[in-house]
Amino acid sequence: RSPFAIAAQLIVLVRPMLPIMLAAIVMGVIGHFCATFITIFGGFALLTAAGLPSPLAGVGTAFACILVFALLRGVLRYAEQASNHYIAFKLLALIRDKVFGALRRLTPAKLEGRDRGDLISLITADIEQLEVFYAHTISPVCIAILCVTGMTCFTASYHILPALVLLAGYLLVGIALPVWSARRGDKAAREYRQALADTNSYLLESLRGLRDILQYQNTAARAEGITAHSETLGEKQKALKYREGLTVAITNTLILFTVIAVLGVSLQLYRNGQMGVEGVLI
């Protein structure tokens, strides 16, 4: 099945807790706007202090707004994360119940097979990864779409060109880079997953055959095998972490270049008389 089909099937499980998810999205959007407008109010304060046109009455008003928005940001962030993790852990409990129900029908015959390491990985690591999906993917994607739309429109209220540059940066960081990273890292992720399953299977075989290992004095060879599996798993994990680090570095670089590009376009528009100094500053 395609990743989109799997994601759609996982999203369906959220339906009973849809009100909580919607609340998390609303709080996330408001919270991100609060965080963004903290710096914008700082810009308004500078405009007011310099005697330039500003939507605020005075510098004191700007600082009061900054304080209120900072407090709101903290409260809303906490509430958003609490809602997302409540949904995630409730659904993880539901999924684990379904998995263990299926295992009860399969055991003990299924655990005698060579793929029992896959089952252990499924019960532990794989299900834990769903916490990232439910707590840090569904609502953040919705929040990102709404915030990108809002900030692009806000920037366009000063001039359309910096808004288009900003939108291009959003699309690069939010869509193009994740798709590229996922395609490049797919092989490494699958290799790590297989190495983890192989290690689990080897450890289970060692535990189940511990009496025979001791009887035939095969402990040294078995220990070397465990070490070899652990080293292989470590190498696969290292490759995966390298790709994660590379993605983070590229993300930060794109964000920096986007900021510089927006500033450069705004300065050029200011020189041409198409944008005021307040637009450049904000």
Q: What does each model-identified segment do?
A:
Residues 1-35, 55-62, 80-84, 88, ...:
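Membrane-integrated ABC transporters
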Residues 3, 35-43, 67-112, 116, ...:
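Juxtamembrane helix-loop junctions of ABC transporter transmembrane domains
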Residues 12-19, 108-109, 125-134, 138, ...:
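An intracellular "coupling" helix at the cytosolic face of ABC transporter transmembrane type-1 domains
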Residues 16, 20-31, 136-191, 261-277:
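Transmembrane helices of ABC transporter permease
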Residues 21-76, 156-161, 272-278:
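Transmembrane helix-loop-helix hairpins at lipid-water interfaces of multipass membrane proteins
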Residues 44, 48, 105, 156, ...:
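Transmembrane helix-loop junction
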Residues 62-77, 170-172, 244-258, 277-282:
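Hydrophobic alpha-helical segments in the permease module
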